[in-house]
UniProtKB/Swiss-Prot annotation:
Transmembrane segments: none annotated. One of its GO terms (biological process) is translation. It comes from Elusimicrobium minutum (strain Pei191). Keywords: Methylation, Ribonucleoprotein, Ribosomal protein, RNA-binding, rRNA-binding, tRNA-binding. The modification 3-methylthioaspartic acid is found at D89. Part of the 30S ribosomal subunit. Contacts proteins S8 and S17. May interact with IF1 in the 30S initiation complex. GO terms for cellular component: small ribosomal subunit. This is Small ribosomal subunit protein uS12. Residues 1-16 have a biased composition (Polar residues). The gene is rpsL. The keyword Protease does not apply. PANTHER family: 30S RIBOSOMAL PROTEIN S12 FAMILY MEMBER (PTHR11652). Belongs to the universal ribosomal protein uS12 family.
Length: 126
């Protein structure tokens, strides 16, 4: 426990909170170019082939970003919009690609939860 004199001289320091998505540099999203699009396997106990991409952001940082949804049209040199948000069973993946923005198309035939996957409202069937 510090003395009053120590507190007068030094004061108390606040703990700085560390950001979970440093590559975005305090921006909500960043644009980037895909350098590699590939699949990877999740940690135990899950099993799948998760679609991910290495993206070089405009902030000159290269990150691994998850491609959500069923099917995608991304390839090398595709321009994408990246947001924060990790994937729990993929170590090192701390970003998501935004579907329906720039070169990333929306998910085909999606009817529910469309806003997260860049899908317009379907025309009402008569």
């Amino acid at each position: 426990m510090p003395t009053v004199n120590q507190l007068v001289r030094q004061g108390r320091t606040m703990n700085k909170t560390k950001t979970k998505s440093p590559a975005l540099m305090s921006c909500p999203q960043r644009r980037g170019v895909c350098t590699r699009v590939y699949t990877t396997t999740p940690k135990k106990p899950n099993s799948a082939l998760r679609k991910v991409a290495r993206v070089k952001l405009t902030s000159k940082v290269e990150v691994t970003a998850y491609i959500p949804g069923v099917g995608h049209n991304l390839q090398e040199h595709s321009i994408v919009l990246v947001r924060g948000g990790r994937v729990k069973d993929l170590p090192g993946v701390r970003y998501h690609i935004i579907r329906g923005a720039l070169d990333a198309s929306g998910v085909e035939n999606r009817k529910q939860g469309r806003s997260l996957y860049g899908v317009k409202r379907p025309k009402a069937a008569k």
